[in-house]
Amino acid sequence: MNLVNRQLVRVITATLASLATLSTMAANAIEEPAYTVARAWESEQIEIRRYAPRVMAVTTMQGSDGDGFRVLAGYIFGGNATEQKIAMTAPVQQSMAGEAEMAFMMPAEYALKDLPTPDDERVGFKEAPAYTAAVIQFSGWASANRADEHWQRLRQFLIAEQIDIAGQPTLNQYNPPWTLPFLRRNEIIVPIALSEAILSGSAGGR
């Protein structure tokens, strides 16, 4: 490798390292939903989590994923009755079955009654109660095919573990668009019926 190529490699490596650091710093600064891990299978990247209640801003997606994101982003960036700016949180949640819906979690400081009225009638709200869910994590780009592949993995795992699925899966994406693929954090999450057998490890065969 000649000198020019070596210098180019150093520049690219330094740039990637800088982007990785910025992506990590940005991710660490964003509020995420509160939960506790009830059980984990680290080799499978699967967890059973107990989530606290939270308020979600939601919209039905009529076109692309980006359309839903822009509608919700418009609301938190001041498109509301008081022109109030609301902090961005993670993850951005997207339904994988039934009606095509996207949701932003509202910061924990907000109760439903505290949120300003949206300017855009396509923005609505949901109060999500406390619930238990199974979660599988993966990195890279969360294309429809990759999301479905990981959902099928999670579903088959839950069947093998004799864990009852109690709702529809959603895709959770935690990172801004410029995050490098290998640093991206994605999850498929599905509500389950929690039992003492699951917590003790006596359900299923693993």
Regions found by a protein language model. Name each.
Residues 2-206:
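A solvent-exposed interaction/effector surface
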